[in-house]
Design a protein with these regions (language model features):
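Residue-level preference for alpha-helix termini and adjacent loops
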Residues: 1, 11-14, 18-21, 60-61, ...
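Short, ligand-facing micro-motifs at secondary-structure edges
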Residues: 1-20, 35-40, 48-54
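Short, solvent-exposed alpha-helical surface patches in well-structured domains
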Residues: 37-40, 69, 79-82
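Amphipathic alpha-helical coiled-coil/heptad-repeat segments
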Residues: 73-117
């Protein structure tokens, strides 16, 4: 899914299953490529394209040609899968570390409160 308008124009989210797509939500569902690889590719390169081409009015938006005319440099499917799996594993590790940091902050806050009681 790609948000086509509003403050989050260009926001990309991978979703598997049923969902409601509203006006100006672009759904990428007919791919013969690794969709997770496509997501990482678009997250890397779509934002700068959007900000170069977005239309301004009361609400910023993009049009279909912003997406359909974007050149995609795609390696073979096997390589896409390897890259997507690698990047997904890194994202999972980042999430674990982020949770550990939040737990450490909570622990630190509790210790500081006990010190000054």
């Amino acid at each position: 899914l790609i948000s086509g308008n509003g403050a989050n124009v260009g926001y990309i989210h991978y979703y598997k299953g049923k969902f409601n797509a509203y006006q100006r939500t672009y759904v990428l569902d007919q791919w013969q490529q690794n969709i997770i690889f496509i997501q990482y590719f678009l997250e890397q390169f779509l934002k700068e394209r959007i900000y170069g081409e977005k239309k301004e009015g009361n609400t910023p938006y993009i049009v279909l040609s912003t997406l359909s005319e974007m050149p995609l440099l795609l390696p073979c499917l096997e390589e896409q899968t390897k890259i997507a799996n690698f990047l997904s594993a890194i994202d999972q590790k980042i999430e674990v570390v982020a949770q550990q940091i939040e737990q450490a902050k909570t622990w630190k806050k509790g210790l500081l409160q006990q010190m000054f009681i």
